[in-house]
């Protein structure tokens, strides 16, 4: 019963200190995330320290003590609730342990298989290279932070950049972003990331060799925010730390605000997911237009494409991956905060189940976006090694051991068998130092101005010092938003319970801006109330400052005030991804006390200007603060070290490392633009030259692919041939195709002359259409598809005859199946202008002479989507995976998934699924491939009876963006017809600038067969509230379809 005595004493303590568990706000925070009150501490002690039987006994005892007193009733209820909390936590911990064990097994198995596939040519020398290459992951801080150490070195680097004119695109979607007077701390979305991306854009824009930087974000025209966030373009002031000497007409750093989502509503980042496609389309439009403008200015008339697209946070990373795939340019990513790490922390608290966490934070959609960034990124930039070793390692798509093996093979020019891993680059954020003048004096003089009166004190000083009874004491400064994970309550408790520290110092808490605590979010307001109660409990009046308002421009003055009083800066967060405020404080001469979890460890190793503490150890925090405040020699040493080493974190040095990483990326851009014979894609010339030129483009494309660099990830049968034989074989094939197309074009030209439609000679025909209808209905049977096509044709029969509306068929069929479908339904190939086949793995155009050559393949499209295509190495792994899927319920253990070689293509590996209900869901196949560093897009289609595996950035929706880029097909003029459900790429077809008609009653079986086991529900990502999305009733007629198109303003009523 000793355990029960302890429990009972804890329960009594809970009743004595602060609000009980039945208090509304305390209950909310207890269920969520707050480490903010003694109540939480006692509850944690009970839940984690005692057996369930002891908790049950305490409840029995409380229940037996019947009394009308309110205290006893509360005690009984509290026992019951804590007992249930303990059981819930135990269950969640068990589930998490099982998941971690399973994950370790899967990763080890995947690593073994990957190494086995690559073991054929693994030599001892290569193994030595692996060990040597690990030096970049060693313990040397200087090695991890390769910085410019002298003016001469910087000048030499600057001279090398002369003549370069790079265009860089940064993306940061959530929060409120503007170039000056940033409202940091206004809400949880407007924090350190906003400051980072703005300063990065400004710093890059001032670097030699960089012509223009665009920071893309969301345009917010809500009346609840400042009007400046609704301005479409803002020129960000160039950093004076930069080294740029030449300017151009459109040069510099710009904040570009793209409208997407609710037009007049500011929404949190968790609600942005359904509108990501709309942002991608708007951003694509801006980049294409800007590339043309820059081409006129600095590109000799040729478009200047971004040298890289850099996404920040998961939502922008998802967008950057799609833009990178659409434009075929390199992608970079910075996570800032990672979903898997947050999920683990929330699960460890035991307050919510995984489903509840996902409902609140849309965490699974966020994690999938982060996995996609690993698939698509050339480089992932982190602030610290801790992010790599403890956070990115949680992801299926990144394995540090396998990454080092692949890197060693690449250095030795040995095949990786289709495996790819992004490079992790540790580049700590920079800082602007031009305005910083470290304070050299102290508070021995007057506190409200200098003696000569020439330099009055900043107003924020008076705002802070009015709280103090003795403002001359050293100031302990904490600057963080009121978030429980920032651990400010432990700091206040440590200060309040350490009498020597209270006697020697004051405490200043800068916790964002507020007007009325009751109007803040429940979490933030509860935390502030808790801090105010602690101030009252420990009687800290006159010793703690907590001003309500400050501007971003006041922050430097706050640092200066703390340094003037010989104070200390503290960051006690439970986990700090980086700790930019620590660098800022050091630049003003402030020693630091910081958490030992995360980025501060690396910062401390470089600056050596303070002490690290366990954020959970209240006494350690108090001791470290007291040591720095009381020992003036230690304080002076830490201050001097910080000022001496702070240049290692300047923005110019950050940008130099950043640009050198970009330079290491393999250059990519739209291939067809390399053709000197390629005239203006949007030419309005009414002649056959368009079609002739594009047939010529096809042969040029092949020539480029043959003359270009070796692609070692295609291990197919043709790779065994001599290169010259392969070259001759492929050129002859395309020459034959070109001749046939040219002949058919010539024959059809005379008949086309009689066509009165403007632009009739253009190839492909989509270039002359006013609107394009994309039929992407994934029907349960081919009869459903044919019925839908005929209804849509009938609905716009007049416009179809006039040629103002064209059609694209987007399907999982290959081109042979498409041709069979058209023949069986009595349709002509020219009824459609283009065919997106194999779920986006192939793109064809209808030919002018359908008898001899009904379809023309777009080979440029293949070169556009081949990024990280695993080729034969991927196919072998897929075949091995398919062989492992066996029907355990069958008598003979039949294979459920088998390779369909007849329907496979160079960029689409097709597999038949014999029993769709028993195959693992698509998320499991993605995980298996990612664990082995194979990057692909697995599409479950045709009601789960087929799996199409295509390049990672290929899809039907991405093919539509390619057509916009290639032919200028206006995305806002597209109407996509889809069923009530569809293949696993269904969500990508709805949303964006294009309009969508959802035909209810079609493809309903897919919801249960292939969408039933998703990571996240479709409702989390589909913009059903968008005015561009409309639903058609079941069995709707062609007349009803026409009415819907009139509602979408596609047709005139």
From Swiss-Prot:
Region entry Disordered, spans: 103-127, 673-693
Keywords recorded for this protein, A-Z: Glycosyltransferase, Transferase
Stated regulation of activity: Activity is regulated by phosphorylation and moderated by concentration of metabolites and light.
Coiled-coil annotated residue ranges, if any: none
Stored Pfam families: Glycos_transf_1 (PF00534), GT-B_Sucrose_synth (PF00862), S6PP (PF05116)
GO biological process terms, semicolon-separated: sucrose biosynthetic process
UniProt biased composition (Basic and acidic residues): 103-115
Catalytic reaction list: beta-D-fructose 6-phosphate + UDP-alpha-D-glucose = sucrose 6(F)-phosphate + UDP + H(+)
Single GO term (MF): sucrose-phosphate synthase activity
Keyword Protease applies: no
Enzyme Commission no: 2.4.1.14
NCBIfam families recorded: sucrsPsyn_pln
The protein's role, per its UniProt record: Plays a role in photosynthetic sucrose synthesis by catalyzing the rate-limiting step of sucrose biosynthesis from UDP-glucose and fructose- 6-phosphate. Involved in the regulation of carbon partitioning in the leaves of plants. May regulate the synthesis of sucrose and therefore play a major role as a limiting factor in the export of photoassimilates out of the leaf. Plays a role for sucrose availability that is essential for plant growth and fiber elongation.
Similarity-based family: Belongs to the glycosyltransferase 1 family.
Protein name from the UniProt record: Probable sucrose-phosphate synthase
Organism: Solanum tuberosum (Potato)
């Amino acid at each position: 019963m000793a355990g029960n005595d302890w429990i009972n004493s804890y329960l009594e303590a809970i009743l004595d200190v602060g609000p009980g568990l039945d208090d509304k706000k305390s209950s909310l925070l207890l269920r969520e995330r707050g480490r903010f009150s003694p109540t939480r501490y006692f509850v944690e002690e009970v839940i984690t320290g005692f057996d369930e039987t002891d908790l049950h006994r305490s409840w029995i005892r409380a229940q037996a003590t019947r009394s009308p007193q309110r205290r006893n009733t509360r005690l009984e209820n509290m026992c019951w609730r804590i007992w249930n909390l303990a059981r819930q936590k135990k269950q969640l911990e068990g589930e998490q342990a099982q998941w971690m064990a399973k994950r370790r097994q899967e990763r080890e198995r995947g690593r073994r298989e990957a190494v086995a596939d690559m073991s054929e040519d693994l030599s001892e020398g290569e193994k030595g290279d692996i060990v040597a290459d690990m030096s970049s992951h060693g313990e040397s801080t200087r090695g991890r932070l390769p910085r410019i150490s002298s003016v001469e070195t910087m000048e030499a680097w600057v001279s090398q950049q002369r003549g370069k004119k790079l265009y860089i695109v940064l993306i940061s979607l959530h929060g409120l972003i503007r170039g000056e007077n940033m409202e940091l701390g206004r809400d949880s979305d407007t924090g350190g990331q906003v400051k980072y991306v703005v300063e990065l854009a400004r710093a890059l824009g001032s670097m030699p060799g960089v012509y223009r930087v665009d920071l893309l974000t969301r345009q917010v025209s809500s009346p609840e925010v400042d009007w400046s966030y609704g301005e479409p373009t803002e020129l960000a002031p160039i950093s004076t730390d930069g080294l740029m000497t030449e300017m151009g007409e459109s040069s510099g750093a710009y904040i570009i605000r793209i409208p997407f989502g609710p037009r007049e509503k500011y929404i949190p980042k968790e609600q942005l997911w359904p509108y990501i496609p709309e942002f991608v389309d708007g951003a694509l439009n801006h980049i294409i237009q800007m590339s043309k403008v820059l081409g006129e200015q600095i590109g000799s008339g040729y478009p200047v494409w971004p040298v890289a697209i850099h996404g920040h946070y998961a939502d922008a990373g998802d967008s950057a991956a799609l833009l990178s795939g659409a434009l075929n340019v390199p992608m970079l990513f910075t996570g800032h905060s990672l979903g898997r790490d947050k999920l683990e922390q929330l699960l460890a608290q035991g307050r919510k189940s995984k489903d509840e966490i996902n409902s609140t934070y849309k965490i699974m959609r966020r994690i999938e976006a982060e996995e996609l960034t690993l698939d698509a990124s050339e480089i992932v930039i982190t602030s610290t090694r801790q992010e790599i070793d403890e956070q990115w390692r949680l992801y299926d798509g990144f394995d540090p051991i396998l990454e080092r093996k692949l890197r060693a093979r690449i250095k030795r020019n040995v095949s990786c068998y289709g495996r790819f891993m992004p490079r992790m680059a540790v580049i700590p954020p920079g800082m602007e130092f031009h305005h910083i003048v470290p304070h050299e004096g102290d508070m021995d003089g007057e506190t409200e101005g200098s003696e000569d009166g020439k330099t009055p004190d900043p107003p924020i000083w008076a705002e802070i010092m009015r709280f103090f009874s003795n403002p001359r004491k050293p100031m302990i400064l904490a600057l963080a938003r009121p978030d429980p994970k920032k651990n400010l309550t432990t700091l206040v408790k440590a200060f309040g319970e350490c009498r020597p520290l209270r006697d020697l110092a004051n405490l200043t808490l800068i916790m964002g801006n507020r007007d009325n605590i009751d109007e803040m979010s429940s979490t933030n307001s509860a935390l502030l109330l808790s801090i105010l109660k602690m101030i009252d409990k420990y009687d800290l009046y006159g010793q703690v400052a907590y001003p309500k308002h400050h501007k971003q421009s006041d922050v430097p003055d706050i640092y200066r005030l703390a340094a003037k009083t010989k104070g200390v800066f503290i960051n006690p967060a439970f986990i700090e991804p980086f700790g930019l405020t620590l660098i800022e404080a050091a630049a003003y001469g402030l020693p630091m006390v910081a958490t030992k979890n995360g980025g501060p460890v690396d910062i401390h190793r470089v600056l050596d200007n303070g002490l690290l503490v366990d954020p959970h150890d209240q006494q350690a925090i108090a001791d470290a603060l007291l040591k720095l405040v009381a020992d003036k020699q230690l304080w002076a040493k830490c201050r001097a070290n910080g000022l001496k080493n702070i240049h290692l974190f300047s923005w110019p040095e950050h940008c130099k490392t950043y640009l050198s990483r970009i330079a290491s990326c393999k250059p990519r851009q739209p291939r067809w633009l390399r053709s000197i014979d390629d005239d203006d894609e949007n030419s309005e010339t009414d002649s056959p030259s368009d079609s002739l030129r594009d047939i010529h483009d096809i042969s040029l494309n092949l020539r480029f692919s043959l003359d270009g660099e070796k692609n070692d990830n295609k291990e197919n049968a043709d790779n065994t041939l001599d290169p010259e034989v392969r070259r001759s074989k492929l050129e002859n094939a395309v020459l034959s195709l070109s001749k046939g197309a040219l002949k058919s074009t010539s024959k059809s030209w005379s008949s086309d002359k009689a066509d009165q439609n403007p632009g009739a000679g253009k190839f492909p025909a989509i270039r002359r259409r006013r609107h394009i209808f994309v039929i992407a209905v994934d029907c349960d049977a081919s009869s459903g598809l044919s019925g839908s096509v005929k209804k849509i044709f009938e609905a716009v029969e007049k416009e179809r005859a006039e040629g103002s509306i064209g059609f694209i068929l987007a399907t999982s069929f290959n081109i042979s199946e498409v041709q069979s479908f058209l023949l069986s339904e009595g349709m002509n190939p020219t009824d459609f202008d283009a065919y997106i086949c194999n779920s986006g793995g192939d793109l064809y155009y209808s030919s002018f002479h359908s008898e001899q050559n009904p379809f023309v393949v777009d080979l440029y499209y293949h070169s556009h989507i081949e990024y990280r295509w695993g080729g034969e190495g991927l196919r072998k792994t897929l075949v091995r995976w398919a062989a492992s899927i066996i029907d355990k319920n069958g008598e003979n253990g039949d294979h459920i998934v088998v390779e369909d070689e007849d329907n496979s293509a160079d960029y689409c590996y097709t597999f038949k699924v014999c029993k769709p209900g028993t195959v693992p869901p698509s998320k499991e196949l993605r995980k298996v491939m990612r664990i082995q560093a194979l990057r692909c897009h697995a599409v479950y289609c045709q009601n789960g009876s087929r799996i199409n595996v295509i390049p990672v950035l290929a899809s039907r929706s991405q093919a539509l963006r390619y057509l916009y880029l290639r032919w200028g097909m206006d995305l806002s003029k597209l109407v996509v017809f889809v069923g009530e459900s569809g293949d696993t790429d269904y969500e990508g077809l709805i949303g964006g600038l294009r309009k969508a008609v959802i035909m209810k009653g079609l493809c309903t079986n897919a919801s249960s067969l292939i969408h039933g086991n998703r990571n996240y529900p479709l409702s989390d990502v589909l913009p059903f509230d968008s005015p561009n999305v409309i639903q058609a009733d079941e069995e709707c007629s062609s007349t009803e379809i026409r009415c819907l198109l009139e509602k979408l303003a596609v047709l005139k009523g």
